[in-house]
Amino acid sequence: QTYDNVWVKANEPTAASQYVTSDQCLGCHSAGGTGLQYDMTAPGTDTKLINLSPYGTWRGSPMGLAGRDPIFFAQLASETQTFHRDAAPMVENTCLGCHGILGQRQAEIDSYAKNGTCEKFSRAGVDAVPYPPDNPSAPLAHYGALARDGISCTSCHRMVLGKTDEAKYAGQPQNKCVEERQQELNPGLAGFAKTFTGSFLVGPPDQLYGLFQEPKKKSMKHAIGNDPEHNANVLSSELCGTCHTVHLPVLHRDQTIGHSYEQTTYPEWAFSAYRTGSTPDGPLPFGAGAQAQSCQGCHMPNKDARGNPYRSKIAAIQEYTNFPQAEHALPPADIDLPTRAGFAQHTLVGLNVFLLKMAWQFPDVLGIRRADPMLSTMGIDSIPTSENAMLNQAANATAGITITEIGSAEGALKALVTVTNRVGHKFPSGVGFRRAFLQFSVLDKDNRTLWSSGRTNGMGVIVDHDGAPIAGELWWKDDCSARIDPDARIHQPHYAVITRQDQAQIYQELVSTPPNVAAPTCGPGAKAEGQLTTSFLSICAKVKDNRLLPQGFLPLADRIEISRALGAGADMAEESGPTEVGDDPEYVNGGRDAVVYRIPLSELSGKPAAVEATLYYQATPPFFLQDRFCTSNSTDTKRLYYLAGKLDVSGSTQDWKLRVVTSGPVSVP
């Protein structure tokens, strides 16, 4: 972070200063910036303050860490070294268009201004630093600094949404290369859908958009030459959906043979009971769902645990009335800030506690500072704050679980485990390798395990009663010399009934490559004929997708109508649905799943006294990590190997899994 400072160039802002690093914002939008007033804080532990400011909550989130995420960069290395070596420039530019968005976009803006072309931003550009000044990357150091800043302030607060604003700013210098990206990644899509994969347009370089009306403008204008402007679109879910709908080329033999949806978090929400039914362009078919809630309503909380709206000033500046007198100060009408209701934390977390642990335990490896730059020792550092938000979300806002119908009959112990999805999209959602799974255990009176499905070893590998990995858990031989029967696409199916300890209910998405033929058929409904893959640009067919549907998930015909209203095709509606779940009535109706466990009493070494069911989550399952380590030998891969090998996962992520919810022991009658 020492190098990561990019400020507005001299004179009025131009497209050459479209993007700046977050340190240009933290002076005012982090708590404690004045040293006298402590707005945007709450009491923490040990007399320390929790920094609730936009910068304070963002900097330790996965969004703030996106430009340094070692998991992402290892995935990118596999894509460019093994999966799609000949397409590496396109792959790097595409992926860094979200994870390193500031650097990628500013580099394209500047290249277009210089020579009229959109030069692709590379992985090497992310590492560019200014010192020593004769190092080869020094001329590109400001792009590296911007990219490492992650999904930062000017990523979102310049975004324009809706046909009116897009028409106003289309064709301007800051959007020339974005429009080219839209044509490359989203051909044939229109309206909001053409902004998928982070392909949104932005406003001018001298405006920043926020939710509050009538903001005091002069402080920001004097500091960075920008006017803060009210724009209600920052409250819309489309602000998130443009990046959290990932539409990518399908590559086969170095050619694009189609496009597929790698990630459908936004459509999943738009098809659920949580949909608001409106966009910046107006209402959508079928209106709001019964539990309407925007993305920001969950991931950017503006209320405390009791439901009371946060009230705070939205910046920490040297006001006229509340500070000692000073010469040349602006009048109170210009710099005295009102207390606002609805102040939103930029928490922006899911459940990737593993990433936060890597950042906290190895800050020197990721090049970050742990200490709060403004509150210093007075404040709780941002990464623990983000981790606590994740743990709270896991425990209280993700899923429910119950065990019913416990009894013995026909020589077997039987129990019904029901899992309820409490989030506004599939669970898990986001990148397709995330997974959740059930552990169901039979216990004796001394709490010893007599039988268990879904138990793991210390590395998070799901194992059977003998400790051997169950089918599909590992993709490679231990020495990475070969895949394990890759054409068989071995995996755990979606179960309605489980009877053995080498069976486990895993909620996941699995996809396959195009088959090795000249003209493969890919897309919704295509038969899986290739190999299981973790490549984002090889998604030809789905093998399995039984991730828990959100409440109120609409039928296909309704999903297609909404998809078309958003400017997408029927394929988005189809790809957002489940795959290979059969006619399981407990699943297909949405919002829940139920599994019957039927255990032969002859397999129990003692008398069953209780049963227990627990839902676990893995952001980086063992097969995914193994595929990283076996498909690249890059510096980024070695870095992830080092971090994963030395990571202390004790506590919330013991045995490389995060407990979401548990039934606790339930007595066997």
Which residues are covered by each model-predicted region?
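Primarily the internal scaffold of c-type cytochrome electron-transfer domains
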Residues: 1-7, 32-76, 112-579, 584-589, ...
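Local sequence-structure signature of Cys/Sec-based thiol-disulfide redox active-site neighborhoods
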Residues: 9-27, 88-92
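Short, flexible, glycine/charge-rich loop motifs used to bind or transfer phosphoryl groups or to couple energy/partner
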Residues: 15, 85, 229
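Membrane helical hairpin/interfacial module
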Residues: 78-92
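Conserved, well-structured interaction surfaces
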Residues: 92, 97-108
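Extracellular Ig-like/FN3 beta-sandwich strand-entry sites
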Residues: 606-608
